[in-house]
């Protein structure tokens, strides 16, 4: 099973909180890094580096420039997972073991928002 959207959002929210101090509850897929979260370019690079480390992916600079929202990053990571399903399963196990509470909180919030 691939990493779920909720698990990726939880992981990205954790990274954003570490880099910027923004509360994970404020981070949703539609939020723009610049317009909504007020993240500057230096912080965005740090978020990208930590995302690469956490998810075992490489985000080229030209791709990073096109990732404008949290949802864009989620979609990008999911696309990379589809290209390498074995790595995605190992990644899912790692994320859930490191962030079970965060993953559960994001899942609950998304379920509430969709009602």
From Swiss-Prot:
Signal peptide: none annotated. Pfam families: PP-binding (PF00550). GO terms for cellular component: cytosol; membrane. The modification O-(pantetheine 4'-phosphoryl)serine is found at residue 41. 4'-phosphopantetheine is transferred from CoA to a specific serine of apo-AcpM. It is found in: Cytoplasm. One of its GO terms (molecular function) is acyl binding. One of its GO terms (biological process) is lipid A biosynthetic process. Gene3D superfamilies: ACP-like (1.10.1200.10). Keywords: Cytoplasm, Fatty acid biosynthesis, Fatty acid metabolism, Lipid biosynthesis, Lipid metabolism, Phosphopantetheine, Phosphoprotein. Residues 3-81 form the Carrier domain. InterPro entries: ACP (IPR003231), ACP-like_sf (IPR036736), Meromycolate-ACP (IPR053393), PP-bd_ACP (IPR009081). HAMAP family: Acyl_carrier (MF_01217). NCBIfam families: AcpM, PRK00982.1-1, PRK00982.1-2, PRK00982.1-4. Belongs to the acyl carrier protein (ACP) family. Acyl carrier protein involved in meromycolate extension. This is Meromycolate extension acyl carrier protein. The lineage of its organism: Bacteria, Bacillati, Actinomycetota, Actinomycetes, Mycobacteriales.
